């Protein structure tokens, strides 16, 4: 139990000391481990008790317990322990992700794109990129539920809310030579009264700052890389992810050049070697030269790996087991067993 003096004044409603054992019970002479979380107190006290009556009903005898002498009794130092929830994919930092120019693209099916102060307070959601603390590049859904590109501390947004539970094709490109950033948001289904979402452009003169040790992420963004104590349980260890995307992502692509809209359309086919008679890893010879990653989530559905069909085979390490074998943007409705139509 924690020392009562270590509670903040007037704030005793929160459980500051929690924990669990690795076993439900042991025989005499066996070992049992306890994992303790101290959210506030710096120390806690351990005392083995003999429970005689644990029923606190006022009609009964109440709680009755007596202390038992044990070598483990005493005071221990404690610290806060965290559980890093949320699923995502990442590739550890590689030189190929240190880009000057880029094009990112993917299909998204958001569940809750907009932050609601009373219901859903998730903040911005990361889609893909290599961005952390106003450095790097990334594609996001911002707090207003609109598509947003980030280059260092600069942002570019369409200003058009993303419809939930629907597929959207999104893409972002940046040309370091001209500073031109372009953002595309194209709903798969365009209803009669829907406004047309035009591509938006912005000139960003300062180039991308590529920090070391920042992984490339899908469905989140990197919050910290300081390797602090609270980050040890994160994956990868020492790096904390935030802004987990709530929804489905399909066919993410990354190229190290600012592609035209026509080339972006061609890249939807991914690293399709059959288009060039298997002479390279792109849908065309020119695009094969700039492909960094082309991930295919239909391959290895029963694994915790996101397969990269690009030239470098940068498979995503998938964390916390996101739901897989979901219907994709190209689902025809003819098959309901994913094993018969994995590409859908």
Write out the residue ranges for each language-model feature.
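Proline/serine/threonine-rich low-complexity linkers at boundaries of modular beta-sandwich domains
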Residues: 1-16
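Short, contiguous strand/loop micro-motifs
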Residues: 19-20, 157
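Short beta-strand segments of immunoglobulin-like
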Residues: 21-26
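Extracellular glycan-associated modules
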Residues: 28-33, 38-39, 43, 59-344
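Beta-strand-rich binding/interaction modules
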Residues: 44-50
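Surface-exposed turn/loop modules enriched in turn-prone residues
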Residues: 53-59
């Amino acid at each position: 139990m924690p020392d009562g003096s270590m509670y903040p004044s007037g704030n005793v409603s929160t459980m500051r000391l929690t924990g669990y054992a690795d076993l439900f019970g042991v025989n005499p002479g066996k070992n049992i481990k306890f994992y303790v979380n101290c959210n506030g107190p710096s120390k806690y006290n351990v005392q083995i008790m003999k429970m005689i009556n644990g029923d606190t009903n006022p009609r009964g005898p109440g709680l009755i317990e007596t202390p038992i002498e044990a070598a483990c009794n005493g005071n221990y130092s404690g610290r806060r322990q965290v559980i890093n929830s949320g699923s995502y994919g990442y590739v550890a930092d590689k030189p190929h992700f240190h880009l000057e120019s880029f094009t990112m693209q993917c299909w998204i099916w958001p569940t809750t794109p907009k932050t609601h102060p009373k219901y859903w307070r998730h903040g911005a959601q990361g889609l893909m990129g290599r961005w952390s603390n106003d450095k790097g590049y990334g594609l996001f859904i911002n707090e207003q539920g609109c598509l947003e590109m980030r280059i260092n501390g600069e942002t570019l947004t369409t200003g058009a809310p993303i419809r939930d539970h629907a597929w959207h094709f999104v893409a972002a490109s940046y040309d370091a030579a001209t500073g031109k950033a372009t953002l595309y948001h194209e709903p798969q289904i365009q209803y009669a009264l829907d406004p047309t979402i035009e591509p938006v452009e912005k000139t960003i003169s300062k180039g991308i700052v590529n920090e070391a040790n920042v992984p490339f992420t899908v469905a989140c963004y990197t919050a910290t890389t300081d390797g602090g104590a609270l980050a040890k349980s994160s994956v990868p260890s020492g790096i904390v992810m935030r802004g987990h995307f709530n929804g489905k992502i399909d066919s993410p692509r990354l190229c190290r050049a600012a592609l035209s809209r026509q080339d972006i359309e061609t890249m939807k086919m991914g690293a399709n070697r059959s288009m060039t008679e298997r002479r390279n890893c792109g849908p065309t010879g020119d695009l094969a030269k700039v492909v960094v990653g082309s991930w295919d989530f239909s391959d290895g559905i029963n694994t915790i790996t996101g397969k990269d069909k690009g030239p470098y085979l940068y498979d995503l390490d998938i964390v916390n087991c996101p739901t897989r074998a979901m219907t994709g943007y190209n689902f025809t409705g003819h098959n309901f067993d994913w094993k018969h139509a994995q590409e859908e």
